[in-house]
Amino acid sequence: GNLWKANWGASLKDPSINNMGIEDVTLTYTNTPIYDYKGSKSNLAAAKTQLSDFITNVNSKTGDDFKNYIAQKMDVNLFLKTYAVNVTVGMWDDYWSNSNNYYFYFDAAGKFYFIPYDYDNTLGTSLLMADSGIQDPLNWGKNADNPLVAKLLTIPEYKAQYIKYLNDLMDKKYDLFYVDYAQQRIQNWQNMIASYVSNDTGEDMEIKDVPANWGNCGFYKLRGNSSADNFFIRKASSIPKN
């Protein structure tokens, strides 16, 4: 198979092979392509063609032609599950919103798998949108610039499945993002590290319930039960119902 790292700007919209390559880093020079191939250099040309063809087909096919193609060439169910998690935790520095922070893999049969990473900008640390806690999960990002998610959601059964996954994450019976259970996990983790917070550097010696100070929604908290500022409660209010 072929593994790629998608760097900032990886919109899955432009099929140009000029955006694809292998990262080259020396002491004096760094070249990082938008689509950074993680396989053998001997396979690069074929991998470029495969990726370019995938991007071309994703953008050019419509209607049943697109539906049939994407069902064959992509693990759509995994992608929808993954995106439900992305949106639920408030991951704005992602593919849909910012063309960023994901890998993808084509298996030996040519099927595409989406692999996100870098979840530091979550749980109330909001930017590039007005409020990552209550942003519409059906219009999370830049549909025109990063078209894959929005195009999938034009297919009724995929949209319904995505909404189901969002609701499953919030459902009390699954013990995932339901506010009481989420807060209990946070408390358990805090208890585990509390005795180690004090350190000989004198830095970061306090546990605070605040998002990163450079975000645009500094009011968010993970503790408490206020619908005005608790991230879990506000996120639940934004989820469309089944």
Predicted regions located by residue number:
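Middle-to-C-terminal accessory/interaction subdomains
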Residues: 38-96, 101-242
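Surface-exposed loop and adjacent secondary-structure segments within mature catalytic domains
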Residues: 1-54, 124-128
